[in-house]
Curated annotation (Swiss-Prot):
Active site location: C164
Function text: The primary product of this enzyme is 4,2',4',6'-tetrahydroxychalcone (also termed naringenin-chalcone or chalcone) which can under specific conditions spontaneously isomerize into naringenin.
Family stated for the protein in its record: Belongs to the thiolase-like superfamily. Chalcone/stilbene synthases family.
Keyword presence, Acyltransferase: yes
Name of the protein in question: Chalcone synthase LF3
Keywords: Acyltransferase, Flavonoid biosynthesis, Transferase
GO biological process, one term: flavonoid biosynthetic process
Source organism, top-level taxon: Eukaryota
Keyword ATP-binding in annotation: no
Residues passing through the membrane, by range: none
Catalytic activity: (E)-4-coumaroyl-CoA + 3 malonyl-CoA + 3 H(+) = 2',4,4',6'-tetrahydroxychalcone + 3 CO2 + 4 CoA
Enzyme Commission number, as recorded: 2.3.1.74
GO MF annotation list: naringenin-chalcone synthase activity
Amino acid sequence: MVTVGEVRKAQRAEGPATILAIGTATPANCVNQSTYPDYYFRITNSEHKTELKEKFQRMCDKSMITKRYMHLTEEILKENPSFCEYMAPSLDARQDIAVVEVPKLGKEAAQSAIKGWGQPKSKITHVVFCTTSGVDMPGADYQLTKLLGLRPSVKRLMMYQQGCFAGGTVLRLAKDLAENNKGARVLIVCSEITVVTFRGPSEAHLDSLVGQALFGDGAAAVIVGADPTPAEKPLFQLVSAAQTLAPDSCGAIDGHLREVGLTFHLLKDVPSVVSNNIEKCLFEAFNPLGISDWNSVFWIAHPGGPAILDQVEDKLGLKPEKLRATRHVLSEYGNMSSACVLFILDEMRKASSNDGLGTTGEGLEWGVLFGFGPGLTIETVVLHSVPT
């Protein structure tokens, strides 16, 4: 008779969790950041608020964003005028859109990842779906399983309302699942659309206006597994993962689901809270590896906004090229909440290959994925690149 210890040993993988494929997707509707203030104040019937529009124009100009993708077209907004007011009851209509479009966009990203993986979808054993953009039962994890035609025995986990740090969270969970379930192949999907957060401007709530200038729609999917087969193509190894709450940060970032949709609130000191806590997180993650030069690792940082990136760069003395991939994704897509860091991973491995660098991590061996969001919660994932 076997022992429990022998059973557990047989259940565990031998090697570290490894990212085997990445896929991304966006809605077709693309908005230009330079002209967005004119569009936004026109569609929300707020053109008479000239001073507020000028403030919003400055926010957009300083955002370092070139364009964003949004499911909400002018046609949809005209059909749902309550979305365009600041505080009009509208949750039912928003939910009706989100519960359909969130899994649909996630499916596009997942199909891209599965194609890049090159293995039958029947080998997927676990699904982790993450969104801050809608709540339903059964959830988007169930809908995705049906849309992709996955096996009914696939093990699912649904993550709601985690916010911008959750791209790190899903990788942490996938690491634990892959390393503790021999042969597991975990499909993680982050799908975010702004249908629950879009609303008209308010002079009394400029933090809401900041969100209107930054957030965009996008979905990203990653397949994670340990002990890759010869037919699989490893991209990054997940070495360690940690989560912590920043001290004295209660209320720095929070959100509330109300009849008017999802309201976000950001304090002005968020950039300083993040930058003041990042080095401690890095030290705890990299001290066991003997690494203390933050320019010697590659960076996957949730963009948040340009002020946060600037302060992190300054605090750590990072060279400008360290956050190139992060700034590129912010410019091309805006802040896509949980999906952002996975888009940045995809951008980095593609650019590393195109530029002829030696590894998927810009030619470097070790890297960090850094996410932050409501709490203020910080996720730190240590990555190990593979040769290109």
